[in-house]
């Protein structure tokens, strides 16, 4: 019985503080009552001098209990030794009880403070961003977001397996957190239901699941990806996310594994799409390895690209904005500027750079966000389209576009001499990895080949301590591409038109807006970019259609595969008729025209366009076929290369003009260090290979790419680049954590930002650099902009270099969206940065929404 009573008391005390306080109050009352009763009894039997009623004795007992000084007020003549002894016991009992209560309350408050600091309590933040896993990406990502949210309040919640106090200490040691930013940490795993309750998931703005670092807990990249995957699946299945299906972005190492978990969660995602509508943003994934490989590969095309990436997608200075027609503050501005092309807008705007248009039409069914970057110079801003631009802030965009109708200026033509980075590229890759699986290496090599813009990759040498025989057969190399341009294949050209599908008010009707017209096609004289092909008909049938409305004339078909069925209809009409009629809504006049095309002219155009496509395919195939014989793998003790590095080491490889240093194994050493010593080898290579000697008076045509592990190491090398001259035309430092953090930060604001980055790093568009050949050039940015716009490229910035007497260089300044009306003084070797397109064939082959007719 006693054990049961004792256990019941212990259980009650464990539950909360109130039970303990109630117990002490009850104990106090019982104690005073017992001692007062003893005093009263002793008074009655004559052992005590005073004689009081019991109530008086009890009241005096409580007075002695609550007031420790009351015992000194007792009259000595009326109390004997036993009076003082018993009454003194009441006072001592009171002191013990109150001391205990004070101790309990103090311990409770201390425990509560410790609980708050250690992240055991539920957070009450709302509209917050939750980050899962404290990886090496986190601090660079928080740095980016602190810059991004400089003008508004935002809360970040960090969930990791580390102690919250330690997490906050690491963050505060590196980042100066602005007053408008609140960061709190909690310990746990995303898949824990108790954790999901504590982080106020049902009121979160966004969830970002970072890939944890390879280490003691997660031994391999597979372990890391599975942790992200099970976190993703658990969060999507939680009751909290069901209440609040906020944006979710998950980082995987392997893209295939990411899509595997997304597909596994498809039932929940599809149901949410039905509930939330087509405008709801479904969960998205990124592959950190793909992103790194792609950026590194693009640096072989455009040296110093990493600097451009940092400036364009960072949050200091100008950045990318999507001017959305769904946003009320932009809708009227966009309507006023419909019909203007990129060239028109950039000629009239002095403070922003328009780099393209986009359409996000989710009527009737879910559709891709269509991004038209560096669109043809005659492709106009159309109804329901938004603008993609580079600007300092939203106020600048509104002010610029509002006043565009008042702008009128004449931009002079200039004729400077620039050189592109289209020299033959010969690459030496120094692989310091210790991995037994070569998949990382084959993926990187294929990424370099796939990203090559000029078809100028002539050789690739890989140096490594040891190779197994699996690479020598070169079966991992991509097959020569087949662009499927032959008859009855998807990219077979008929009219030489690239188009995308336009929705109409009716679900089963659509139009086909012309994006561009091949220069070989005679239709370029009759049609323009922006015109909408409503339908196609025979000459006889067309006569019966002239009185019909635009909607009635629009092509009717069930959704899915519309472009294929329309193309089949066109082919059939051409086969059966000597002429066909294109029913077109002109973009300028908005009038519907019936345009006749002769069969023989179609045949001539088709042959010319097809021939140009064959030449594109042939050039690409030739490069890849030649590479099979010019990719070599050589075993070399790279530790000796580093240890014995001297001024002459680099000259052994001077016949190659692109050096890449990387270590996949070090990428997996992801411990948080003040001094990441695993990067010392790469820093030594960076310094050693910077001793490349240039021929007298010759400007650099070599480039170097160094992959390092820690963002602290990156800061050191960036500081070197700023203060020391380099013999390289471009000197890229690739650091995975900064790359991924910028990508994630961009996606935090608008997922279209990540789609834009993907486009710029695909075989659809590319970022190019043009080196000034002239000794000097003075021109406004507007004049330079016009010069490149006429070449169908969009100028976004300038890299200004400082040169020494030996033609070595260091970056003096990178200007993205500089002041456009002021004169810019450029010297020989300075580089202008543009966004350019791959050819038409690559665009339709890579794009999900552009098709060829």
Language-model regions, residue ranges each:
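Cytosolic regulatory regions of ion transport systems
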Residues: 1-59, 63-546, 550, 557-559, ...
